[in-house]
C-alpha cells in the first residue's frame, strides 16, 4: 500500500490573494505533492490549505510553505476572528494510507525542529506529536495567542518545544503549532441569530469540554469548584468535539465553529443532528452548514445512508445519489454550492487523465459502446461484453430490489430489499470495472508482440512477458464469472420474494448474468489455450466449469419462479 499523508496548514492570511498564491505555489513546487484545496476566509483572515502525497515530499512542502509564510506575513499587523499564534498557525500531518499516526508524529517533531533550526520559527508540538501530555490539546499550546508569546517564551514551563528567547524572527512569524492527528473535520453551523452569546451557549452544550459549572446553573452564578479548589466543568454531549460561537461579518449572523477530532466516534451527521437539537432547545435554528477543507468520502456516504435509513428508503442506490442525500440533509449547499468532486479527498486525489484511460469504455454512451464494439478494432471484445452483460444482470436485480423496497404496503420490509440492492450495487460496480480491465488485459498481450526479439535474451524476455500477460488475460474473465455468479442469488430472491410486477425483470437479470458467465468462460478457455505451460491454467478452467454448473442451476430456479408469477 502506498504511504500517503495529508497536511492541512492554516496560514494567518485570508484577504491578500497574492500572499496566499505565493504560499500555495511554494507548496505545489515540490514534486510528488498535490494541492487539493485552498480555502481562504476573509472574516477570519485565515487560509486553510490541504495537500497530500508521500511522507517525504509532504514534509518538504510543509517546510517551504512555512518559510514563504514567514517571508510574507507579519504577525504584528495581523487581525482576524480566529485564534492564532503564528504566520503558519497550525501545521498538522495526518495519516491517509500505509502509515501510522505514530510515524506521522515522528515526522511532525522532525519538521518542528527543522523549522526552528533553519528558519528560527518557534514551534510547539501538539496532539500525537506532543512532548508533554497537556500539549496534546492545541488550545493549551495556543493559549493567549500571538500576543502572549513574549511572556510564554520567557517561562520555562510554557516556552515552545523548539525555540529560544523572544526575538525579531518570533515577533514577525509568531509561533507555529506542529502536530499529528487523525483525520479532523472542521465545520461551521450558521444560526438564525446575531447573538454571539447564544451561539457560544450552543457550542458549550455540545463540545466535549462543556461549560464551567455555576451555582444554581445560572449564567451569573458563582463558579463551582471541587474539594481541590479546581473548576468544575459540565461536559457537553459530543465526545472529541471542540466548538466555539462567534459572529461572522461576512454572513451577518452568528455561527458555531466546530472541530470533530474523531469521526469514528462522532460522525459528521451525528454532530449535525446534535447541534440542531441544541440550537432548537434554545429557540434557534441551523440555517446552513459549511465544511472547511476536505472530508473523506465515507463521511458523506455514512451520512447519506443515515438519512435514507431514517426515511426507510433503500440504500442500494448510486454513490452520487447517496452523496446528494447527505448534502441536502445537512444543508451543505445552503451557503454556497457544494460539489463533492471539489470537497471529497478521494475524488481530488484521482488523476483525471489516468482515470479517463482506465474507464474509457464505461464512460461511453450505450450507443458509443456498441459502435466501438462493432468497429474493426479487436477490443472491446467478448470479455468486456461478458462483463457488461453481468453488470446489467446485477443492475436489473438491484432495480427489482429498489422497487420492492418502496412498494406500497411493504414498508416493514424495506430493509430486507435495501440489503439486496446494496449488494447489487457493489456487484454492478465490480463488473463495470471489469469491462475496462478485460480490454486492458487484451492490450497487454498486444504490447508483448511489439517487444524486440533480435537476440536470444530478447526472445526469452518477450516469451516470458507474453506467457504472463496471457495468464492474466485468462484470470480476468474468471473474475467476471465469480462476480456475475453472485448476482444470481439476488435475482432468485427477487423472483421469489420481490415485487410480482417485476418478476420478468428478475428473470432477465438471471439470463443476462448467465450470458455474461458463459461468455467469460469462453474467454478463460481461449486464453488458457494460448499458454505454453498449461499447468497454471488448470485451476482456472476447473473453477470456470464449476461456476457454469452452479449458474445454470440457479438460472433454472429463477425462471421457474418467474414463470409461476406470470402464469398465475
Whereabouts are the PLM-identified features?
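Amphipathic, well-ordered alpha-helical segments in soluble domains
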Residues: 65, 369, 395-399, 434, ...
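Polytopic transmembrane helical bundles with strong interfacial aromatic enrichment
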Residues: 356-365, 371, 479, 483-486, ...
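A structural-propensity feature for long, helix-poor, extended segments
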Residues: 406-452, 547-556
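Preference for long, well-ordered alpha-helical segments
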Residues: 111, 121-125, 134-137, 487, ...
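Amphipathic alpha-helix face/heptad-repeat signature
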Residues: 388-392, 420, 427-434, 473-483, ...
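Conserved phosphate/anionic-ligand binding catalytic regions in large, soluble enzymes, centered on
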Residues: 7-13, 80, 85-92, 373-400, ...
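Long, contiguous binding/interaction regions
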Residues: 1-368, 375, 453, 461, ...
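Amphipathic alpha-helical interface segments
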Residues: 183-185, 438-511, 515, 527
Amino acid at each position: 500500500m502506498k504511504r500517503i499523508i495529508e497536511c492541512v496548514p492554516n496560514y494567518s492570511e485570508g484577504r491578500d490573494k497574492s500572499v496566499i498564491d505565493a504560499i500555495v505555489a511554494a507548496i505545489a513546487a515540490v514534486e510528488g505533492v498535490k494541492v487539493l484545496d485552498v480555502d481562504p476566509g476573509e472574516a477570519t483572515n485565515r487560509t486553510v490549505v490541504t495537500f497530500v502525497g508521500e511522507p517525504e515530499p509532504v514534509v518538504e512542502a510543509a517546510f517551504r510553505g512555512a518559510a514563504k509564510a514567514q517571508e510574507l506575513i507579519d504577525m504584528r499587523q495581523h487581525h482576524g476572528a480566529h485564534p492564532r499564534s503564528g504566520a503558519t498557525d497550525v501545521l498538522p500531518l495526518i495519516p491517509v494510507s500505509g502509515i501510522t499516526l505514530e510515524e506521522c508524529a515522528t515526522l511532525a517533531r522532525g519538521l518542528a525542529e527543522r523549522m526552528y533550526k533553519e528558519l528560527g520559527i518557534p514551534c510547539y508540538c501538539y496532539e500525537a506529536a506532543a512532548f508533554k501530555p497537556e500539549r496534546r490539546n492545541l488550545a493549551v499550546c495556543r493559549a493567549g495567542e500571538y500576543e502572549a508569546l513574549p511572556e510564554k517564551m520567557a517561562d520555562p514551563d510554557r516556552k515552545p518545544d523548539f525555540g529560544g528567547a523572544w526575538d525579531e524572527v518570533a515577533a514577525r512569524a509568531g509561533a507555529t503549532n506542529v502536530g499529528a492527528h487523525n483525520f479532523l473535520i472542521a465545520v461551521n453551523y450558521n444560526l438564525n441569530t446575531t447573538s454571539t452569546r447564544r451561539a457560544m451557549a450552543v457550542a458549550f452544550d455540545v463540545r466535549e469540554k462543556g461549560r464551567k459549572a455555576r451555582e444554581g446553573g445560572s449564567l451569573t452564578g458563582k463558579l463551582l469548584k471541587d474539594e481541590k479548589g479546581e473548576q468544575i466543568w459540565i461536559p457537553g454531549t459530543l465526545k472529541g468535539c471542540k466548538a466555539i460561537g462567534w459572529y461572522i461579518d461576512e454572513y451577518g449572523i452568528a455561527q458555531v465553529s466546530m472541530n470533530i477530532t474523531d469521526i469514528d466516534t462522532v460522525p459528521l451527521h451525528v454532530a449535525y443532528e446534535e447541534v440542531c437539537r441544541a440550537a432548537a432547545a434554545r429557540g434557534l435554528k441551523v440555517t446552513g452548514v459549511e465544511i472547511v477543507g476536505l472530508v473523506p468520502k465515507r463521511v458523506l456516504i455514512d451520512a447519506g445512508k443515515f438519512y435514507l435509513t431514517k426515511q426507510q428508503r433503500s440504500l442500494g442506490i448510486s454513490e452520487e445519489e447517496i452523496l446528494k442525500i447527505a448534502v441536502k440533509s445537512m444543508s451543505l449547499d445552503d451557503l454556497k454550492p457544494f460539489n463533492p468532486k471539489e470537497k471529497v479527498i478521494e475524488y481530488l486525489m484521482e488523476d483525471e487523465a489516468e482515470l479517463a484511460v482506465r474507464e474509457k469504455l464505461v464512460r461511453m454512451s450505450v450507443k458509443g459502446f456498441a459502435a466501438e464494439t462493432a468497429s474493426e478494432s479487436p477490443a472491446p471484445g467478448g470479455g468486456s461484453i461478458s462483463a457488461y452483460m453481468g453488470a446489467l444482470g446485477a443492475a436489473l436485480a438491484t432495480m427489482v430490489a429498489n422497487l420492492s423496497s418502496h412498494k406500497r404496503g411493504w414498508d416493514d420490509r424495506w430493509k430486507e430489499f435495501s440489503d439486496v440492492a446494496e449488494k447489487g450495487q457493489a456487484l454492478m460496480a465490480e463488473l463495470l470495472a471489469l469491462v475496462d480491465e478485460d480490454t486492458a488485459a487484451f492490450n497487454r498481450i498486444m504490447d508483448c508482440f511489439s517487444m524486440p526479439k533480435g537476440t536470444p535474451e530478447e526472445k526469452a524476455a518477450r516469451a516470458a512477458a507474453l506467457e504472463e500477460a496471457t495468464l492474466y488475460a485468462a484470470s480476468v474473465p474468471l473474475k467476471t464469472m465469480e462476480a456475475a455468479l453472485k448476482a444470481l442469488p439476488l435475482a432468485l430472491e427477487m423472483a421469489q420474494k420481490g415485487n410480482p410486477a417485476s418478476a420478468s425483470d428478475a428473470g432477465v437479470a438471471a439470463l443476462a448474468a448467465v450470458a455474461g458467465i458463459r461468455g467469460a468462460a469462453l474467454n478463460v478457455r481461449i486464453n488458457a489455450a494460448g499458454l505454453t505451460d498449461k499447468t497454471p491454467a488448470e485451476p482456472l478452467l476447473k473453477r470456470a466449469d464449476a461456476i457454469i454448473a452452479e449458474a445454470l442451476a440457479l438460472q433454472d430456479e429463477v425462471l421457474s419462479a418467474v414463470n409461476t408469477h406470470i402464469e398465475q
